[in-house]
């Protein structure tokens, strides 16, 4: 009975304290609020915050020794088992801060996000991408550990040198192992990216325009997809609930079929290693005909969150793709927008979904076109854009040439000038 009770009772979250250096470069209060939410997503509870305003970090420990004493006392008093730093630390900084806190475990913001991704990864590709990001994060920290081994082994005499040599040998083995694993993961992911590219080509041949939902994590992208297409995608009120892109067919009011893609959510200062590891997944947005930027209508930081979304998109060569902006969760108190170009929706109540679908129809009407063409037999190569990036719906070999009816993208219209029927 007690074993069953243990299974049914949820393990309480790990208590942590948050540490931050406020250099006046960003809103420290908002950043810590987001860090607290990230902790919650990793089954942690932030029980205290210790911040320090200073222009330059303290050498080796980032915060001043007095602040770290304050943090150590808070951790001991409140029973915190870990300190989470709002930023990225080097291996030596993590070690020095941990020593100053009496041996308390220390992680940084990057490690926290990577751990969340690791726990959320479901598909094989997602797991490999996360492992790659984790290894790239840890590799330079192995080097920091090597410096510590050198200092420890430098006490003098042949014995010290022997200890240092043994330590450095183990470090080199660790480095080689990590480098080899990184290379192996990169090779596997490159093969998966090749297959993803083949899937994109197959998808393009259907002629269905692609619409991607992008935005900050936990703004309701999956809920919006389910509201538009019918329940299928897993929903959860948590950060990074979706790591792998999910595609669903959506019929617009005009009868046009489109492919709606739900993508991984963003967060401010998304770790570079994570962006690199998930680049092939994030690049789904770059193959879209329309991008829907989704924000939480009730979140005061929605404009900042959209700015983060645009920053990531700009790095993925999406500048020329039309974008719609949607404030989802408009049923929440305080949700509003005075901008006529912003669409208000509620995946929960269905409000605004018809308007969103009509707007998609309007935008896509400028992106795809239905054509009837007759190509002379010495010009059959001109059919390639319709076959590869659009769709062929009717194909007839006639006496005077090849007759085609189908869908083409706007950028391919010029290929058929002079051959329209």
For the regions a protein language model found, what residue spans apply to each?
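C-terminal-of-GTPase-core extension/linker across diverse P-loop GTPases
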Residues: 1-17, 140-219, 225-226, 230, ...
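N-terminal accessory targeting/assembly segments
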Residues: 1-114
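Conserved C-terminal guanine-recognition region of P-loop GTPase G domains, centered on the G4
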Residues: 5, 30-40, 72-77, 87-104, ...
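Conserved beta-strand segments of the P-loop GTPase G domain that flank and frequently precede/overlap
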Residues: 18-22, 49-52, 84-86, 292-296, ...
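Flexible beta-alpha connector loops of hexameric P-loop NTPases
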Residues: 22-27, 56-61, 120-126, 170, ...
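Short alpha-helix plus adjacent loop in nuclease-associated cores
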Residues: 111-130
């Amino acid at each position: 009975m007690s074993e069953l009770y243990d299974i049914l009772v949820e393990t309480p979250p790990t208590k942590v304290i948050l540490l931050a250096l406020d250099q006046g470069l960003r809103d420290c209060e908002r950043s810590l609020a987001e860090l607290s939410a990230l902790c919650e997503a990793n089954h942690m509870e932030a029980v205290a915050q210790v911040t320090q305003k200073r222009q330059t970090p303290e050498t080796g420990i980032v915060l001043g020794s007095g602040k770290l004493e304050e943090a150590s006392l808070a951790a001991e008093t409140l029973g915190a088992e870990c300190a989470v730093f709002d930023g990225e630390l080097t291996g030596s900084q993590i070690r020095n801060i941990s020593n100053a806190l009496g041996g308390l475990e220390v992680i940084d913001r990057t490690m926290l996000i990577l751990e969340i991704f690791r726990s959320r990864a479901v598909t094989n590709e997602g797991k490999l991408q996360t492992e790659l990001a984790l290894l790239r994060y840890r590799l330079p920290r192995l080097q920091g550990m090597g410096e510590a081994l050198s200092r420890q082994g430098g006490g003098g005499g042949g014995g010290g040198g022997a200890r240092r040599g043994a330590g450095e040998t183990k470090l080199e083995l660790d480095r080689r192992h990590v480098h080899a694993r990184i290379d192996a993961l990169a090779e596997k992911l490159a093969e998966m990216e090749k297959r993803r590219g083949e899937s994109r080509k197959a998808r393009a041949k259907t002629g269905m325009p692609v619409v991607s939902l992008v935005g900050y994590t936990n703004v309701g992208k999956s809920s919006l997809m389910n509201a538009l297409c019918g329940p299928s995608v897993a929903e959860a009120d948590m950060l990074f609930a979706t790591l792998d892109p999910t595609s669903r067919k959506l019929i617009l009011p005009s009868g046009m079929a489109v492919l709606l893609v739900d993508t991984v959510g963003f967060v401010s200062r998304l770790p570079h290693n994570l962006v690199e590891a998930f680049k092939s997944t994030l690049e789904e947005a770059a193959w879209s005909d329309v991008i829907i930027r989704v924000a939480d209508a009730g979140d005061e930081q929605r404009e900042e969150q959209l700015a983060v979304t645009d920053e990531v998109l700009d790095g993925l060569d999406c500048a020329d793709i039309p974008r719609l902006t949607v404030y989802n969760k408009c049923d929440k108190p305080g949700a509003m927008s005075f901008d006529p170009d912003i669409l208000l929706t509620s995946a929960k109540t269905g409000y605004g979904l018809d308007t969103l679908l009509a707007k998609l129809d309007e935008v896509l009407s400028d992106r795809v076109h239905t054509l009837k063409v007759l190509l002379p037999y010495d010009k059959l190569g001109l059919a390639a854009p319709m076959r590869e990036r659009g769709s062929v719906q009717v194909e007839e070999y006639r006496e005077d040439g090849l007759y085609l009816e189908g869908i083409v993208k706007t950028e391919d219209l010029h290929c058929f000038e002079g051959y329209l029927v």
